[in-house]
């Protein structure tokens, strides 16, 4: 609301509308536990309608578990874990470790307007990282250390923020 948007809570498939802009101008998929979120999306018959809206161009942002749900491929997924997909990337669940391994770091994030004089501070809580991206996926931020998934031309370490068309995903929690 502070940014001028009018948030709408989505609890049921009827809250989604039939097309982008019908009821929603965009979607924020928060952090949480991705397998539980996947189970609930399936139980409440929201998985297919959300997939269709995303495929039709609904802008969406996913943080942490939201990143996992927006990925086309996941390493370490639970058996039967459903994804929304949409971003041509492979993510690794809980890549930075368990809850006790949560940490904070200043990122290399020129794609998010941050630079050496203005780093982007990020909080990682049981976070995924991006193992690889497909063509057309823009890498927006990396950690300062670690292997950048062998992606040529990528400075820094692990990939932690990407954009693919109208979809944006971060492995960190910007709200913290």
Predicted segments — roles?
Residues 28-30, 124, 169-171:
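Structural motif
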Residues 148-176:
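A glycine-centered loop/beta-turn motif at secondary-structure junctions
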Residues 6-8, 121, 138, 158, ...:
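Conserved beta-strand segments of alpha/beta enzyme cores
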Residues 8-14, 140-145, 158-163:
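Beta-strand->loop->alpha-helix junctions that form or flank phosphate-binding loops
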Residues 63-65, 87, 126, 172:
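A secondary-structure boundary/capping signal
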Residues 75-155:
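Pocket-forming structural segment of enzyme catalytic cores
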Residues 2-62, 68-75:
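Flexible gly/pro-rich beta->alpha loop and the following alpha-helix that scaffold active-site loops
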């Amino acid at each position: 609301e502070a940014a001028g948007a009018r948030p709408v809570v989505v609890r049921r498939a009827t809250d989604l509308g039939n097309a982008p802009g019908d009821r929603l101008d965009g979607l924020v998929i928060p952090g949480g536990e991705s397998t539980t979120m996947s189970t609930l999306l399936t139980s409440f018959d929201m998985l297919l309608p959300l997939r269709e809206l995303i495929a039709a161009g609904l802008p969406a942002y996913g943080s942490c578990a939201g990143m996992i749900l927006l990925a086309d491929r996941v390493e370490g997924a639970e058996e039967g874990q459903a994804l929304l997909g949409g971003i041509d990337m492979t993510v690794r669940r809980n890549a930075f470790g368990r809850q006790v391994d949560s940490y904070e770091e200043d990122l290399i994030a020129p794609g998010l307007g941050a630079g050496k004089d203005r780093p982007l501070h990020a909080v990682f809580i049981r976070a995924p990282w991006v193992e690889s991206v497909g063509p057309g996926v823009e890498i927006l931020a990396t950690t300062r250390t670690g292997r950048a998934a062998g992606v040529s031309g990528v400075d820094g370490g692990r990939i932690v923020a990407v954009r693919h068309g109208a979809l944006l995903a971060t492995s960190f929690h910007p709200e913290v």
